[in-house]
Amino acid sequence: MEKIKISIVTICYNSGSTIEDTIKSVLSQNYPNLDYVIIDGASTDDTMNIVNRYRDKFSVVVSEKDGGISDAFNKGIANSSGEVICFMNSDDVMLPGALDAIAQAYDGKHDIYCGNVLLENPNTGFKCREVPSVNFPIVPVLCHVAHQGMFITKKAYNHFGGYDTNVRYPMDLDFLMRASRKGATFKHVDYDIACFRAGGTTSNNIFKKKKDYLYIVRKNGGNAIQAYYFYYFLVMTQFVKRILNIFGENFSQKLRYKYSK
């Protein structure tokens, strides 16, 4: 029986120092029914030189200016032909056996298949495991979101819509809240899918994302009080994390997550 077609989309911009590791980690899966798509935001470094070295391995390569991460994600969806789609961006590394694990778990009955993701501290090398949330309430405190571990069906994107270009950073949380509210079904796949380095575009200064967080709670059915509660919960979480890390840079992660390494 032929395995399902899986689309992997790598979004990149000036990622010459990291993208080759991402590409190699995907290609080394040796998955027989892979649709690999590259969406580049008109990089000015050697990103495209690296991409072109593997050009025959990709189904689609797009290199042009975009309107932000959400716009790039939507381009990736539009250019994908797989039954499920995962975004494995240019700071991420797919772990061995990931695609086989998803193919084995796929049953055609769910909209979103969520695997585990390892978070790596690039300063210390410490890794911890993030187990995904499969329920996203109006105020999504304690919800874990890592698009590197999410395989979303093309049908789900067609039904629930793509990524809101009004959201600059937590666009994956916005999508999951919207999809959950509209009845999306989730399946947890207990397998380590990918590793990503903490400190990337969507894991930096919480204050830059205030407008986004207030917006997505309100648009997904919350009121102003709930929106501000969620935002200041995140602010307080960051504050507590900094305090705990006085006892060691990885101390807060050790308390929050199951150990991986």
Give names to the regions the model predicted.
Residues S17-E20, D45-R53, V93, G97:
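Acidic helix N-cap motif at the loop->helix transition within catalytic regions
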Residues I4-S7, D35, D174:
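Cell-envelope/extracellular polymer assembly enzymes that use nucleotide-activated donors
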Residues I85:
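Short aromatic/hydrophobic "clamp" motif used to bind/position activated sugar donors
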Residues P32, D40-N49, N89-D92:
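A conserved acidic beta->alpha catalytic loop
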Residues R129-I216:
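Conserved nucleotide-sugar donor-binding catalytic segment
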Residues M1-S28:
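N-proximal low-complexity "stem/linker" segments adjacent to membrane-targeting elements
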Residues S63-S80:
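Glycine-rich, basic loop-to-helix element that forms the pyrophosphate-binding segment
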